[in-house]
């Protein structure tokens, strides 16, 4: 039986948070930082932190694909647990928090990277337990911003940002990137529908200013107790 791409829980509360999600290199961090400038008192929680040497090591080992049966599961478990810890601590601050990607997207990365069924079964069980706590105790985000674009935009942005680990290992990971790209947008939309998460879909091939303006208009329409500046 194939593992379904759709989680099956329903939300219990809304967190004081926004998530910016989407395919690798579509500009999530840039958009998150731009939104933070317009939401008074808000902060950005980054997916990757400069001082996190373990995350850098695991990411590099995964992309190198020399021992992916070991490093891919370690990478996915580390990111999932680390992201959940950040979310539960920061998702209900007095002022909005903007998250660079979410734990929902971690499942998709894990599905593409963990190749041993027994290990993925363990990961899936762990992930489901974490997500139950997230949605019932801490809450789903008030808005999920989904950045979409074409394959050409992905390649352009990936090489433009020039992260050594991605460029050096692009050939090894091209099929992985293509498979991820094909299902990414629909997966996030399905997650939002299944979890009852309010979301907006934005074309990533626009200026930062244009995307920011569109998202702020959506936030204004939701009548949240957030000060937009």
UniProtKB/Swiss-Prot annotation:
CDD domains: dNK
GO CC annotations, alphabetized: cytoplasm
Keywords tagged on the record: ATP-binding, Nucleotide-binding
One of the record's GO molecular function terms: ATP binding
Record bears the keyword Membrane: no
Binding residues annotated for ATP, in chain numbering: 22-29
Keyword Amino-acid biosynthesis carried by entry: no
Pfam families registered for this protein in UniProt: dNK
InterPro entries in the record: DCK/DGK, Deoxyribonucleoside_kinase, DNK_dom, P-loop_NTPase
Superkingdom: Bacteria
Name of the protein in its database record: Uncharacterized protein MG268 homolog
Organism phylogeny: Bacteria, Bacillati, Mycoplasmatota, Mycoplasmoidales, Mycoplasmoidaceae
